[in-house]
Curated annotation (Swiss-Prot):
The gene is glmM. Its cofactor is Mg(2+). Catalyzes the conversion of glucosamine-6-phosphate to glucosamine-1-phosphate. It comes from Rhodopseudomonas palustris (strain TIE-1). Activated by phosphorylation. Binds 1 Mg(2+) ion per subunit. PANTHER family: PHOSPHOGLUCOMUTASE (ALPHA-D-GLUCOSE-1,6-BISPHOSPHATE-DEPENDENT), PHOSPHOHEXOSE MUTASE. It is an enzyme of class 5 (isomerase). Its EC number is 5.4.2.10. This is Phosphoglucosamine mutase.
Length: 450
């Protein structure tokens, strides 16, 4: 069955475009019905980021859940990993995060978590999706069985304590000057407070949300302001979260960005040395740099690759028993602590290493030199350009040229008629020639099919 609503990270789209109050109401009803098992009183935790449309979607979801007899616990603006954690700790049947993650304010989304704090399986999402297109009027609760909604106090403190417990109790961040960029998003209150409680000298930016400025020229997808602030304040480290704080990138004391691949390298190596790796392996996606794979191999650590998307990384981790995984974009999953990506918890592990080693971030977090990587997109109108004989030949020729010295990844986008061509290797000029050859062949095939 093709999926009309759910993508790789819940339901996401333009607010009042795809994401309407009507859809949110229906999602609340369908998800509420899907998770009402047993005779106990059922309840759902709902959190959100700071987008203007969050109010609209939150109220519609509340109406949907309460109409099928579910009680609603509202926690307000909170990081996605906090909502996942609270869903489990508050013994809820379901968790919901209203967010479009790193997108700008015009978009919004609905992420769903099961009772243990994990994102829903494909099968459960399909079950909910089927109900979205049918009438649920006959399944609504009777008047005396409707749900109630209440706002929960103290949830910020719960997440702060949870995050602090991922570090040794005796560890202090005293002496570290930290610039934190919360992307004007969900973490704008809790993360600066947590860093202060741990003893850091905290300088905060991206902590003045107005409903419109989430991820706007700030956060993990736009770290330029953070880089400048780190240099200006002569800070030891910068931390950039995205709008819902499930991804992170760091900035060293020189103002240089440290991406998710470098974070996987430093955490993987450090945890292996400390005997904390569950197995000698790290899970990443097909987009992670070949330099990471080579570095880990030199440390006796395998790199397992999955399709793009943190849900696939987590699935592989749970299936094979690995406890470190993530994406180059900064989704870092440490399954000893979390059931989903947690940007702040990942950053704390690196801060702990910096304190332990007594060395600057530029030394701690630069474990390998990334190979030159080139990514180009080819748009097409119709047909199947990847089946064209000229394209197949160009790909085969490219693989021969890069054999042993690089790799190719050619994949169609899951959301638009675009084919992404990524190449990386030791020689940038060769990689560029190979990628351009494939792009030209795809362009010719697309033009012929138009």
């Amino acid at each position: 069955m093709s999926r009309r609503y759910f993508g790789t990270d819940g339901i996401r789209g333009r607010a009042n475009g795809l994401i309407t109050p009507e859809l949110a109401l229906k999602v609340g009803q369908a998800a509420g019905l899907a998770f009402q098992r047993g005779e106990h009183r059922h309840r759902v935790v709902i959190g959100k980021d700071t987008r203007l449309s969050g109010y609209m979607i939150e109220n519609a979801l509340v109406a949907g859940f309460t109409s099928v007899g579910m009680d609603v616990l509202l926690v307000g603006p909170m990081p996605t990993p906090a909502v996942a954690m609270l869903t489990k700790s508050m013994r809820a049947d379901l968790g919901v995060m209203i967010s479009a993650s790193h997108n700008l304010f015009e978009d919004n989304g609905i992420k769903l978590f099961g009772p243990l704090g994990y994102k829903l399986s494909d099968d459960v999402e399909k079950q909910i999706e089927l109900m979205l297109d049918e009438s649920l009027d006959k399944k609504l609760a009777q008047s005396a069985s409707l749900g109630r909604a209440r706002r929960i106090d103290g949830v910020h403190d719960r997440y702060i304590e949870f995050a602090k417990r991922t570090l040794p109790r005796e560890l202090s961040l005293e002496g570290l000057r930290v610039v934190i960029d919360c992307a004007n998003g969900a973490a704008y209150k809790v993360v600066p407070e947590a860093l202060w409680e741990l003893g850091a000298d905290v300088i905060s930016i991206g902590v003045e949300p107005d409903g419109f400025n989430i991820n706007k020229e700030c956060g993990s997808t736009a770290p330029q302001a953070l880089c400048a602030k780190v240099r200006e304040m002569r800070a030891d480290i910068g931390i950039a979260l995205d709008g819902d704080a499930d991804r992170v990138i760091l900035v060293d004391e020189r103002g240089h960005v440290v991406d998710g691949d470098q974070l996987l390298a430093v955490i993987g190596q450090s945890w292996k040395e400390d005997g904390r790796l569950a197995k000698p392996g790290v899970v990443a996606t097909v987009m992670s740099n070949l330099g990471l794979e080579r570095f880990l191999a030199g440390e006796g650590i395998a790199l397992l690759r999955t399709p793009v998307g943190d849900r696939y990384v987590l699935e592989q981790m749970l299936k094979d028993g690995y406890n470190v995984g993530g994406e180059s974009s900064g989704h870092i999953i440490l399954s000893d602590f979390n059931t989903t990506g947690d940007g702040f918890v990942a950053a704390l592990q690196v801060l702990a290493m910096v304190q332990k080693l007594g060395r600057p971030v530029s030394e701690v977090c630069r474990r390998f030199d990334p190979l030159p990587q080139i990514l180009k997109n080819v748009r097409y109108r119709s047909g199947r350009p990847l089946d064209d004989s000229g394209v197949i030949s160009a790909i085969q020729d490219g693989e021969k040229r890069l054999n042993g010295h690089g790799r190719l990844l050619i994949r169609p986008s899951g959301t638009e008629p675009v084919i992404r061509v990524m190449g990386e290797g030791d020689d940038r000029d060769v990689v560029e020639e190979v990628v351009d050859s494939i792009v030209d062949a795809l362009g010719n095939a697309a033009a012929a099919a138009a």
